[in-house]
Amino acid sequence: KALITRQIEDFCGLLHGAPLGTAHRSISRSLNFLSGEALQTALSTYRAQLYNPESPHYNEGLYSLILAWEESSMKVDSAQKVAAYLQRVRLQHNAVGRTAQDFLYHTSDTTGTVSRRLSHFSAPYTLLVLSVDSDKRNQQWAEALHRHKALYRLVQEKHLRPLVVYTGATRPDSTLRSLWSGATLGYDSAKLITAQRRYDLSHGSALYLLDAKKTVLLRNTSIPKIATYLHARDEE
C-alpha cells in the first residue's frame, strides 16, 4: 500500500506538462494493472494529489481523467461509477473560463438587510470567498491580502472587490469584520450554495477570482496566485 501511494505521488509529478492525450493513456494504463485494495489505494492517492488545492500537483483537468476512468471501468461497482459521474459533472460547474453560477445572498446596507445577486456585484475583478464554518482559511486569506501591499492597493482602489459569503451559521466577529474592512459581507440565507451544491465546498472554504462579467479566472486558489495572475494581466 505504501509503495503504491509513493509511486502514484511520483507519477503525478511527472504528469504535469504532459499533453492531455498522453496523460490520459498513462493514467489508464496505471489503473488497468490494478484491482481490489491496490486499485482503491491508487484512486484515493490520485484524489489526494490532483484534487486537493493544498497539493503541489493539484490539477482538476487531470483529476477529471481519473473520474472518467472510474465511470467506464468494470473494476468499480455501480455506486462508485455514479459517484464519479456526479463529481465530474460538478467539476464542470464554475470551471475556469465559465461564468460563475449565480446565487442570491443577503447583506446589509443603510436601509437594513437586503437581497443581492452575485451577477449584480459590480467590480472589474471580484475576490469571491465562500466561507465554511470552522474553516480558518477565511481569516488567513484576509490576513494574506493585507500583507500583500500591491494587491491590497487594488482593493483600496476598488479595482478588486472582495465579496465574502458565509455559507453556514457562523457570522464574522469583530476581528474578521476589521480584517475584511471594505469587503461586502454576505450570507447564504437561501441555502442555494450549500443545499443545491452550486459550488464545490468539499475542501472547505473556497476562493475564486472573477472578472467583470463573472467569468471564473481562478478557483480553489490562493492570495499569492491571484496577485501573480493580476500582475500578469496588467503587464499584457
Provide a role label for each language-model segment.
Residues 1-113:
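Oxidative protein folding and maturation machinery
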Residues 114-148, 161-165:
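Short active-site neighborhood of thiol/selenol oxidoreductases, capturing the structured segment around
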Residues 121-122, 155-158, 199-203:
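A structural signal for short secondary-structure junctions
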Residues 129-133, 164-168, 187-189, 211, ...:
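Active-site proximal loops enriched in glycine and acidic residues that flank catalytic Cys/His/Asp
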Residues 139-179, 190-195:
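Structural microenvironment flanking redox-active thiols in thiol-disulfide oxidoreductases
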Residues 175-208, 212:
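Short, internal strand/loop/helix patches
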Residues 203-206, 212-236:
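Non-catalytic, surface beta->alpha helical segment in thiol-disulfide oxidoreductase systems
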